């Protein structure tokens, strides 16, 4: 149940990502948008406003690959898993949470490029740390039920 809710939120953030990108592109004139940020959170590179569309398309592609691609989940683990029945729900949970955190980060970047929110590198680092923590936590749980 919880995984379905997280997957629904991931799809919602991806749809909002596309909506914000289309809204920004269709309602603004040809302006320079921030395309590169330095570590001090100030933009130092700018691009055309249409660059938000490939960024949003890349977000959709990443979401679709994470969510719907066929993957051999047990092959990518650093240890052998014999209890596949117990490990599979943990792997599904890990992938749904990772997809959620990645789509949330990409939505935040599109909002920052559309200049609706300021880009804070610290927030992206927190999301990245949460992503790594979720993966490590799930791999430890999978390791415990592997036999």
What are these regions (language model features)?
Residues 1-14:
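Alpha-helical transmembrane segments and their helix-start/interface "positive-inside/aromatic belt" motifs
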Residues 10, 92-99, 124-128:
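Alpha-helical transmembrane segments of integral membrane proteins
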Residues 14-24, 57-62, 66, 96-110:
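Hydrophobic alpha-helical transmembrane segments of multi-pass integral membrane proteins
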Residues 21-53:
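Active-site and channel-lining beta-strand-loop segments
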Residues 42-60, 91-96:
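Interfacial helix-start motif at the membrane-water boundary
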Residues 71-94:
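Cytoplasmic juxtamembrane regions at transmembrane-helix boundaries
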Residues 105-147:
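Alpha-helical transmembrane segments of multi-pass integral membrane proteins
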């Amino acid at each position: 149940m919880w995984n379905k809710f997280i997957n629904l939120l991931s799809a919602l953030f991806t749809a909002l990502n596309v909506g914000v990108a289309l809204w920004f592109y269709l309602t603004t004139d040809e302006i320079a948008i921030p395309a590169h940020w330095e570590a001090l959170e100030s933009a130092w590179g700018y691009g055309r406003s249409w660059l938000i569309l490939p960024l949003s398309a890349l977000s959709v592609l990443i979401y679709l690959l994470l969510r719907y691609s066929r993957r051999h989940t047990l092959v990518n683990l650093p240890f052998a898993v014999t209890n596949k029945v117990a490990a599979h729900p943990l792997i599904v949970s890990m992938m749904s949470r990772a997809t959620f955190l990645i789509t949330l980060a990409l939505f935040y970047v599109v909002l920052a490029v559309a200049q609706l929110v300021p880009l804070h590198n610290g927030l992206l680092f927190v999301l990245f740390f949460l992503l790594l923590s979720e993966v490590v936590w799930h791999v430890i749980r999978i390791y415990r039920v592997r036999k």
